[in-house]
C-alpha cells in the first residue's frame, strides 16, 4: 500500500478534474507544494479548520472516486504487468510467456 501522501498525489492526478477549483487549489497546495494548513488558510483568508475540513472531505471524495472507478488500481496493475514484461524480455522468455503477459494487459478493465 502506498503511503498516504503518495496515494493522495496519485488520486489527485487521476481525479482532479472532478473536483471544484477550490478543492484543487487546496489539495495542490497541501499535497504538491507542501503548504501547511495555516499557510493555506492565510492565503485564502479562511480558518485553519475550514482548510482542514475541505481537505478531509476532498480526500474522502477521491477515495470514493477510486472505489467506484479504480483508475489508480488499474494503473498499478498495468505498471506491474509492464515491469514483468520488461523482465521477461530481459531473460528472453518464451513467446508463450510474453503472450500471456500481453493478454493480461489486454484484458485489464
Swiss-Prot record:
Might take part in the signal recognition particle (SRP) pathway. This is inferred from the conservation of its genetic proximity to ftsY/ffh. May be a regulatory protein. It comes from the Bacteria. It comes from Halalkalibacterium halodurans (strain ATCC BAA-125 / DSM 18197 / FERM 7344 / JCM 9153 / C-125). Pfam families: UPF0122. Coiled coil: none annotated. Belongs to the UPF0122 family. InterPro entries: RNA_pol_sigma_r3/r4-like, UPF0122, UPF0122_fam_protein, WH-like_DNA-bd_sf. This is UPF0122 protein BH2485. Signal peptide: none annotated.
Amino acid at each position: 500500500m502506498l503511503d498516504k501522501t503518495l496515494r493522495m498525489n496519485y488520486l489527485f492526478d487521476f481525479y482532479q478534474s472532478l473536483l471544484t477549483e477550490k478543492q484543487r487549489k487546496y489539495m495542490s497546495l497541501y499535497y504538491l507544494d507542501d503548504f501547511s494548513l495555516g499557510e493555506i488558510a492565510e492565503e485564502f483568508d479562511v480558518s485553519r479548520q475550514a482548510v482542514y475540513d475541505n481537505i478531509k472531505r476532498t480526500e474522502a471524495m477521491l477515495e470514493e472516486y477510486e472505489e467506484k472507478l479504480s483508475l489508480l488500481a488499474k494503473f498499478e496493475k498495468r505498471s506491474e504487468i509492464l515491469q514483468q514484461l520488461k523482465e521477461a524480455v530481459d531473460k528472453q522468455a518464451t513467446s508463450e510467456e510474453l503472450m500471456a503477459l500481453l493478454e493480461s494487459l489486454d484484458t485489464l478493465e
